Amino acid sequence: MLWLTVSLTGFALLGVVAAQQIEGFYYPYHLLGLSDGCVETLNTTISSCSQVLGQQANLDSGAVRVLVAPDLNELCTTACVDDLKSLKTKIQSTCSKDDVMVKNDIAYPGSWKAQLESPFGYDDSLASDFSSQTSSCHATGFTFTTPTAYALNTTATPAPTPICQRTYTVLATDTCASIAQANKVATFGVVSLNNLGTGCEALVEGKTLCLPETCTLRKITRDDDCGQVVKDANTTIPRLIAWNPMLNPECSNFLDYIGYYICISCLLRTPGGSAKPIEGETAITAVPVPTNANAESQKNCAKWYVVQPGDGCADISVANGITLVDFYFLNSGVNRDCTNLWLGYAYCVKPVGNIQTYPGYPVTVPSTSFTRPPALTETSTETLVLPTPTYAPGTYDNCSDYSRGMPASWSDAAKLNSCSFIAHINGVTVSQLLQWNPSLSKDSCSLSRELYYCVRMGQPVSEPIDYDGTLCMNIQDDKDIVPGTISNCNCFSYVSGGLGKLYTTCEDIVSEFDYDVGHLVELNPWLTKANCTKELFADLSGPYDYRYFCISNTGDPLHQSPAKSQTRTIHTTSTVQRAVISTPSSVSMTNSAPATATSTGGPPAPTQDGAVSNCTKWHVVESGDGCWAIYTKYGITSDQLFEWNTKISKDCSNIWLGYAVCVGV
């Protein structure tokens, strides 16, 4: 499914939208000097219109994004259009010709005239529109003088061409993540330097890539966070952000890059986080400020960059060898979420001399200890405050995983939001979901899109998870089936684009159904065994872009007896709104403990292999237990639990239900 865009004609109602209230978007109409009746009418909430309309009308001053099919289905409803037309008619009848919106005591024609007479505000198209509108309104007294163009004898530095220290030729089986891992470079560097797109969709066999500098790597998993990564790497959050410029200053977008390899140590970066200048490249004088420079950028600048279509702040910083933090400092008018870059305008991308000498530059001061009578040691600390999602009422606050429901407009949303399905893919039971989320109802248990729920407490227990539903998706339109799929397929699943394609392969998928890639290709002849993964995800750009594929022509494979062994792997997603098979991690589940387990007289139940002989305290594994839950319950550390139970793996995927583990010596 290809990305879809909204035609400009879709904004024909923009004037109406801006004069009323969409849920979640508010405007102080009472401050505009309008009549009481007009204000009351304008203050009407149109509940039938989606918040997507407010976002696309730019009511939140954010970025207008490209929409995909589910967004369009939510946006383009007959009820919304009818209600907007009705409100427009009511506004026209309630608000008189004296109800003129005068913001900040400036009449609109007058402010427009002043703008057109300024060399900084004049534009031929705006001038034509102004003349046309004042003429149609029979407004007089607004004749303007075309200003003399304001010019400098300089132009902005053209977009730089990346200098490649190394190159790489793409193979048929490559992904952005595999290239990054093999060459010891960050995934984002590979993606941004070569304009491959967030989902790596522009990666083509035979293409020559420019590789970024090497560094020590770590792959982001769904269980990571910035604090844990910097602790493990013995570094700091400012350094981590400096080495990985796609991370925002608060590091709150860390989990947007699950599956990416990031730098946790980089020799070519200074400890403070700024890009270390290559010898001889430190600028000592500023270049002339270009005529198209952003007004709020530093004028004491050694290099300017003109924003091109598709650019983002992180892309610009990587291409110009500057950290994202420094880019924001040199261009203070840019929002920290980079939603207000102006196309065709120039931004400063290189300081003059040492950027730390600029007034107002935030300098990181090392931790300091000093003594004064009486002796007192003070140590500076670094605090990271991350935004928190809205949790369901009463939901446990110590869970290891949270999730929310899919949008109602999605195919099979009711099934995929059901507690039985959520429990199944997370390796827990419905009873546990109800226990961890008291707001959920046993009779109609389903996750809401607006709230986050606890879906896992520690690691899942190694036991089969009952699920009486089906993995088969309900296809609404046969046109969604890829041509060439076998005609007798009676069970479909689907995959999504975006980050999902970075860590999902055909091998991951078939491992769930106990057959090989060859059989998957037989079910879907439009795939080939040699390029199965690439063909499965072809043209899937974003996380809301998905494709159906056949997983069985003999019924739901979930309810068929496994042919090869008792062990089955259920792949899970970090958030429920991703496609069913989009796998950053997996939970291994077994039907029973191995028959070789032994029992002793002391423990209250059979023990797992590897328990120490001097154990004095035991815990019998119950449904819902995981390593985190066990060592937290007994006030011990994870290291102690693994030391006393040497055969338990670090990911706790092999503890056995009903067996005793040592929790004290």
Swiss-Prot record:
SMART domains: LysM. Induction: Expressed constitutively with no significant difference during colonization of banana roots. Might have a role in sequestration of chitin oligosaccharides (breakdown products of fungal cell walls that are released during invasion and act as triggers of host immunity) to dampen host defense. The LysM (lysin motif) domains are small globular domains involved in binding chitin in eukaryotes. Lys3 contains 5 LysM domains. The gene is Lys3. Residues 585-610 are annotated as: Disordered. Residues 1-19 form the signal peptide. One of its GO terms (molecular function) is chitin binding. Glycans are attached at residues 43, 153, 234, 398, 531, 614. It comes from Pochonia chlamydosporia (strain 123). Gene3D superfamilies: LysM domain. It holds the Pfam family LysM. This is Secreted LysM effector Lys3. The lineage of its organism: Eukaryota, Fungi, Dikarya, Ascomycota, Pezizomycotina. Keywords: Chitin-binding, Glycoprotein, Repeat, Signal, Virulence. Residues 166-211, 216-264, 303-349, 409-454, 617-663 form the LysM domain. Residues 592-602 have a biased composition (Low complexity). In plants, chitin acts as a microbe-associated molecular pattern (MAMP) that is recognized by lysin motif (LysM)-containing plant cell surface-localized pattern recognition receptors (PRRs) that activate a plethora of downstream immune responses. The keyword Repeat applies. Belongs to the secreted LysM effector family.
